[in-house]
Amino acid sequence: MWWSNLFVDMNKANFFNFSFLPKYASYFVDGVLNTLALSIVAVLLAVIPALLLALMRLSKNRFIHGLSGAYIAVFRSTPLMVQLAIIYFGIFYIIQVPRVYIGFIRLDMFIPFVVSLALNSSAYVAEIFRAGILAVDSGQTEAARSLGLSQWQAMKLVVLPQAVKDVLPALANEVVTMVKESSVCSAYGMGELMFAAKNVSGTTLISVGPFVFIALIYFCINFPASKAIEAIERRMRRGDKR
């Protein structure tokens, strides 16, 4: 049967050769830790600038509106790998970060990449926040203004708390997306999962097995996380209906 031949061919191509694990398991443990640290910290760092960008996008001042629009357009219209190269080889060539380890994190590698990912993520999270703010009934803002609150006070005390609550699942989804996108950092030597697989593949000459293994790791991280986010969204929707 053709599928049995396919299985044999895949086996010959080392698809299922995980013999490297006993010796190189620590590479993948470090890779998982670096991947999760990059992803979570990047999205957390992106939240404040993203919120500012969203408010700027909603501003009636044409300059402020245009400035935020230009930022979002640049980061959403250029490849992440190009952004990483400009920030890592450009900005952080000027700003020298000491080669210091904090636990498993090497700061001179981690900081440039987490800043790059955060700047990229902020462009997407800004649109998430903007949609969340626009989804809040405008009547609530008008009611707050009628009670004597300023536009800023109405935004801070009435609109933003509701908008942030509504966009939390989307922010969690952004972390899942960032887990996958952080793999591009391997091109510049960041020791995350993709970098670990490349190193192990090059050292052991097992061409495909290490990449199949990290694909399984990515799946085991992202699939349960996605299902948990869906469950949270359903629970929040039920809560809103009560």
Predicted regions and their residues:
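Transmembrane alpha-helices and adjacent helix-loop boundaries
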Residues: 1-242
